[in-house]
A protein has these predicted regions:
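Bacterial N-terminal signal peptides that target proteins for export
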Residues: 1-10
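Detector for methionine-enriched segments
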Residues: 1, 14-15, 82, 120
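Catalytic glycan-binding domains that act on GlcNAc-containing polysaccharides
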Residues: 26-158
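Domain-scale selection of a single, long terminal region
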Residues: 20-25
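Bacterial N-terminal signal peptides
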Residues: 10-19
Length: 158
């Protein structure tokens, strides 16, 4: 099964490289999104994640809606542009971030980048890490990563 995943990962990686090249060539492409371009860029730089990957995650998570609230079957709540899960709140509150702060697009982008960086430290710079941003099980991680890849592809076509 592991051998089967490499072509998928290679194709997805080429797609991301194409998206980054295309967006960089058209002047950045993230300036008109739900948060100012500087928020995406600063968060990406601070947590060493790709800003276009952050945008794709936000698109999948909230449809780029800063005020989005999602309720989960386990009783947790997802808050804001990056749909930060309420299970993160105890840790965030230790850093002075309250639930209402997550409705601020810039705060949400920074926290989302921090969460993604945590997942990348755990799983490496992989699609598994991207999937872990949203899901715990391997099957759901893979499904979520595919959605993010599709969001990146849609952005490339714009």
């Amino acid at each position: 099964m592991a051998g089967r995943r490499y072509p998928i990962i290679a194709a997805a990686l080429m797609m991301v490289i194409g998206v980054v090249s295309t967006v960089a060539a058209d002047g950045g492409g993230i300036a008109s999104l739900a948060a100012p371009a500087t928020c995406w860029e600063q968060a990406a730089r601070r947590y060493q994640v790709n800003p276009y990957l952050l945008v794709a995650i936000a698109e999948v998570e909230s449809g780029l809606r800063p005020g989005a609230i999602g309720r989960n079957t386990n009783g947790s709540i997802d808050i804001g542009l990056m749909q930060i899960n309420s299970l993160w709140l105890p840790e965030l509150q230790r850093h002075g971030i309250a639930p209402r702060d997550l409705l601020d697009p810039c705060v949400s982008v920074h926290v989302g980048a921090w969460v993604l960086a945590q997942k990348m430290r755990l799983h490496g710079n992989t699609w598994t890490a991207v999937g872990a941003y949203n899901a715990g099980s391997a099957v759901l991680r893979e499904r979520y990563a595919r959605k993010v890849i599709e969001a990146l592809a849609r952005r490339e076509q714009r």
